[in-house]
Amino acid sequence: MKKISIITPCYNEKDALYECVKRINDLFQKELNTYKYEHIICDNNSDSETVNILRNIAAKNPNVKVILNAKNYGSVKSTFNGIKNSTGDAVLLFYPVDMQDPPEKIPELVKNWQKGFDFVVGCRSQREEFFLMKQTRKFFYFILKNFSKNEIPMNVSDFQLVDRKIVNQMVKLKDNFPFIRTLAFEYSDNYTTVEYTWKKREIGNSKEFFKDYISSAINGLISVSDAPFRFILMIGILVSIFSISYGLFSLFYNIFFQNDLDKGMPTLLISVLIFSGLQLLVLGFLGEYTSSMHNQIKKQIEVNEKEKINF
């Protein structure tokens, strides 16, 4: 009987935990009853109430395994550590405790994996969220798809079922900040996609803030490609050509048609502001790449596990 591993990061999620675990257990009692499973919950130093709930769940269900981290390492590092601790023939890399990625899609992921695909990717074709956030994500996915060195589908998510042979390659990666949703694409092109609606959160509140989304997006772009450098270079070349052309035009226009150069001050100020902004943008990207290289050169920081339950 084949085994499926499911990884769930957790931080102060006492309101959603019981339902999250129940949904998975029900699936393997019914639709997926020909498979064994382990549900690895990676807790990022939550409050005592959340930890007590985790202990209670694990005591009643041996399929639920809990890793209690000594501190909050964030969802990415704790999830990757959970993947390292998994033993299944296939691993669901990320199953959120808020169930916005619907557990009802897991049987479809498993069915496609059994057809021989190395991994099956969940794609969020629809999103139940406000307009501005939806458009921001669309722009990010457009950049990710078009600048990545691998062929990555639009709206790719971490909700992926990955075969053990690919997982074994992934966990060898020495990366302090792995971008999990694109890792499998580094090792195989043999995949298929499953589309679904990313649902509005119904239980509890999100522990992720806007800065966390920005950090994840920057990390993702840096991880998958050096194209931002080339993109900035192209912008720089185009802006330089435009500014030189406009400068020559302004010079000749003022020489031959008017004598009052003060009238050009607004244009000068706008130009200075635009180019200053571009310089800061370039420096920002350089800083991000330099910081990324610095973090990779440093010895990898492992997750300090305070306690493991049911392992």
Where is each model-derived feature located?
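Short, well-formed alpha-helical segments that are part of the catalytic scaffolds
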Residues: 13-30
